[in-house]
């Protein structure tokens, strides 16, 4: 080999060496810090590079990211209060491309002094201490349940879920006297619509890690609109390879199944995840008709079917601190049950069906050495909705069959075989900037788009009009700016925010379809409003055991697609709807007694006042229905809750809520005196609560086993589903009492078995509009978990 070639090769090796050193100098260490026992993320854990002043802290999801300078130590120290510190060597096995992936599990300190156990504050308790009025349902409360999310929420303080039957039937969430469309639903912070649009029963409880219920004020970072509050569902995020399968069988041919899979690619933080759900319920129970004494009605056309799956990829090692892309598809089919509001209409053939597909993208990135954090969530969904009502015959509950009054169809004036196409886009952008150690500025923008393309050729041929309506579009933007200030070492927190609400819709009103024969023009509705809020929290006593909080808010709820577009069957378009407005006040306190040892007791109290106007209500005519702005409502009330951990194996809990919602319109619709002025709002429970006890013990049957027994008793005072104009009101929903018991056993932390009896007293209970509920039901659930796949 010539000297020239030797020199050339030497220079090449030298250049490559310097290049490698430069790449290594720019390495970034990243990862997630979690509790080694619960795998919950640790917010605020410190990561320090040995023999340097370089360090960082983990964010709210436990993620950290830190640059490693050249020739620095390759050892980091991870610390968190109440946990054992860890020293970690960053070796080549952790390298991923030009970065180092280092996920850290910290073990809690085992501070045991005789029978005194140091407990400290859980993540859920820290969430409760925020300025907003909030109820937290954590993973420990969900652990022993076989119930659906609707039933879980129904037992929370200040919350009531009004259902119209078994699994798959319509339900609405009531928070502080506001219900349904006024309650926002979020999943991992992403707005999914309101509680009327989104079916909580479609989410298996085994996929849920925590439920946050915001009462009155919706936090700025959620970014949605609403009057009564919001429900944010945090799904489980597994930090290791994980496969989980669950199946439940219950009375009345009810079956619920779910599967969750997450598989990490090698030793990277990139993972593939998938999930599947299956729900089926025949709902074939009987009830005593409230309209005809002695008549027993059997629900024989109320079956519900739901199947869904999702696949996706997530990563923490790419340019983004957090990346997740998910594709999902769902199928729903629901039979329509007759005889609920009368005894004549025994529907036997009509049903609804929905097929949908969506894609969701979540991104998170920190800038400026962690001072600025950007989060972006996007969901694009498509759905095809069918309402099928084509029978030539109608039926009654005596067994008679007779021809349909319109020739075909059991429900409306004309038959239906609709093929309505819906397109939805929901996007959320959060920017959070940290100023020093005690200030945060958050800017949030939420965009929502909805488009309906109705089609029902069968109905149009009978009515000779486009019965299902015309194409309609909806755009809305909610943008808000919030400033958070913490003083006196975090003992005082103040949040001040402002929001702008913009609404734009294009709807072809149904009235023009009747009156005009030429080309129709869309009715355009534009509206821009502003809202504001202020919330504060003051922590007192050692360990911040007492938290006082108060909040005030002027907020807006914009009309949704269903209210504007109609349904093409009985519900007409309402193109001139105005947004609802509300002024809300909340004040409360949380007292944590013996925060660091047994017996531990938490007492919470919250009072509220709300004054809402331009309330959107459903108005009835002889043939159809339509929404209109006619309402003015005042709500006031109080909710209290108590939770106690008496010792290692015994927990107690209870709550009670009183709310008073009144009609405050002095003038009736169309003029004249409103005879319902100051009457209680119909179909709104005003006094309800529940108590529960839970016994749990580890190692009872074997060293790695866990056993539990739980019992809850819930009550709802009788209330009217019409205006209480007379002391002898016949439209009354009787008081509801329900006693449930459950046992749970976990074998070697993999196989779990649960058995629950609901309504053990076998009472005949009724829900809103006196819809009948199930009597005693039995539920058997099995779950199997594999952490090595």
Name the predicted role of every residue range:
Residues 240, 248, 265-348:
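Periplasmic-side early beta-strands and strand-to-turn transitions of outer-membrane beta-barrels
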Residues 102-104, 205-242, 787-788:
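A beta-strand signature from Gram-negative outer-membrane beta-barrel systems
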Residues 312-332, 354-517, 523-535, 539-543, ...:
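Face-selective signature of the C-terminal outer-membrane beta-barrel domain
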Residues 65-67, 190-216:
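Short acidic/polar hinge/loop motifs at secondary-structure boundaries
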Residues 541, 549-553, 580-636, 657, ...:
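Membrane-embedded beta-barrel scaffold of Gram-negative outer-membrane proteins
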Residues 34, 46-48, 79-83, 95-143:
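Short, acidic, small-residue-rich periplasmic hinge/interaction motif at the N-terminus
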Residues 491, 602, 607-611, 628-720:
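Gram-negative outer-membrane beta-barrel transporters
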Residues 210-212, 219-220, 235-264, 295-304:
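Short strand-turn segments of transmembrane beta-barrel domains in outer membranes
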């Amino acid at each position: 080999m010539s000297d020239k070639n030797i020199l050339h090769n030497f220079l090449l090796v030298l250049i490559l060496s310097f290049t490698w050193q430069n790449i290594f100098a720019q390495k970034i260490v990243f990862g997630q810090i979690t509790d080694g026992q619960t795998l919950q993320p640790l917010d605020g854990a410190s990561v320090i590079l040995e023999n340097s002043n370089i360090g960082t802290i983990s964010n709210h999801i436990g993620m950290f990211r830190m640059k490693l300078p050249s020739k620095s130590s390759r050892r980091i120290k991870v610390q968190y209060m109440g946990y054992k510190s860890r020293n970690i060597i960053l070796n080549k096995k952790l390298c991923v491309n030009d970065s180092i992936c280092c996920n850290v599990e910290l073990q809690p300190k085992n501070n045991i002094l005789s029978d005194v156990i140091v407990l400290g504050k859980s993540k859920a308790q820290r969430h409760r201490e925020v300025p907003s009025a909030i109820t937290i349902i954590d993973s420990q409360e969900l652990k022993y349940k076989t119930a659906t999310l609707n039933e879980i929420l129904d037992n929370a303080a200040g919350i009531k879920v009004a259902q119209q039957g078994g699994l798959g039937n319509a339900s609405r969430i009531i928070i502080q006297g506001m219900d349904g469309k006024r309650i926002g639903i979020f999943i991992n912070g992403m707005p999914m619509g309101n509680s009327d649009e989104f079916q909580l029963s479609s989410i298996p409880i085994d996929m849920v890690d925590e439920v946050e219920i915001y009462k009155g004020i919706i936090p700025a970072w959620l970014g949605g609109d609403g009057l009564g509050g919001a429900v944010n569902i945090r799904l489980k995020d597994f930090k290791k390879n994980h496969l989980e399968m669950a199946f439940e069988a219950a009375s009345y041919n009810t079956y619920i199944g779910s599967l969750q899979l997450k598989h990490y690619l090698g030793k990277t933080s990139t993972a593939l995840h998938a999930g599947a759900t299956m729900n089926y319920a025949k709902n074939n129970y009987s009830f005593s008709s409230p309209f005809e004494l002695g008549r027993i009605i059997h629900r024989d056309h109320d079956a519900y079917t739901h199947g869904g799956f999702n696949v996706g990829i997530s990563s923490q090692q790419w340019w983004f601190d957090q990346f997740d892309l998910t594709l999902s598809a769902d199928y729903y089919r629901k039979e329509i049950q007759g005889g609920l509001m009368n005894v004549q209409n025994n529907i036997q053939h009509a049903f609804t069906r929905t097929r949908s597909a969506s894609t969701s993208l979540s991104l998170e990135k920190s800038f400026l050495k962690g001072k600025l954090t950007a989060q972006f969530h996007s969901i694009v969904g498509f759905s095809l909705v069918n309402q099928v009502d084509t029978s030539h015959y109608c039926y009654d509950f005596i067994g008679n069959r007779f021809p349909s009054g319109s020739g075909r169809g059991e429900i409306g004036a004309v038959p239906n075989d609709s093929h309505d196409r819906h397109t939805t886009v929901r996007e959320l952008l959060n920017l959070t900037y940290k100023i020093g150690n005690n200030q945060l500025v958050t800017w949030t923008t939420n965009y929502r788009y909805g488009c309906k393309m109705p089609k029902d050729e069968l109905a149009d041929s009978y009515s000779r009009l486009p019965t299902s309506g015309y194409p309609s579009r909806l755009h809305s933007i909610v943008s808000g700016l919030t400033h958070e200030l913490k003083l006196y070492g975090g003992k005082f927190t103040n949040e001040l925010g402002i929001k702008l609400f913009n609404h734009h819709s294009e709807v072809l009103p149904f009235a023009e379809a009747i009156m005009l024969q030429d080309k129709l023009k869309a009715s355009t509705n534009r509206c821009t409003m502003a809202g504001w809020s202020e919330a504060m929290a003051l922590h007192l006593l050692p360990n911040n055991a007492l938290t006082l909080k108060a909040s005030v808010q002027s907020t807006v709820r914009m009309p949704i697609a269903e209210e504007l577009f109609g349904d093409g069957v009985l519900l007409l378009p309402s193109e001139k709807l105005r947004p609802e407005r509300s002024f809300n006040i909340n004040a409360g306190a949380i007292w944590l007694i013996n925060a660091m040892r047994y017996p531990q007791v938490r007492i919470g109290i919250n009072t509220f006042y709300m004054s809402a106007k331009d309330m959107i209500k459903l108005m009835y005519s002889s043939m159809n229905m339509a929404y209109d702005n006619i309402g003015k409502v005042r709500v006031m009330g109080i909710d209290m809750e108590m939770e106690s951990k008496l010792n290692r194996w015994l927990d107690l809990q209870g709550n009670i809520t009183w709310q008073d919602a009144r009609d405050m319109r002095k003038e009736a619709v169309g003029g004249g005196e409103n005879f319902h002025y100051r009457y209680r709002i119909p179909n709104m429970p005003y006094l309800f609560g529940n108590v529960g006890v839970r016994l749990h013990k580890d190692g009872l049957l074997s060293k790695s086993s866990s056993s539990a027994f739980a019992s809850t008793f819930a009550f709802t005072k009788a209330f009217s589903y019409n205006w209480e104009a007379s002391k002898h009101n016949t439209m009354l929903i009787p008081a509801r009492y329900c006693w449930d018991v459950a046992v749970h056993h976990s074998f070697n932390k993999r196989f779990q078995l649960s058995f629950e009896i609901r309504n053990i007293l076998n009472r005949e209970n009724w829900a809103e509009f006196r819809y009948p509920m199930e009597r005693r039901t039995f539920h058997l659930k099995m779950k199997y978990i594999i952490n090595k796949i």
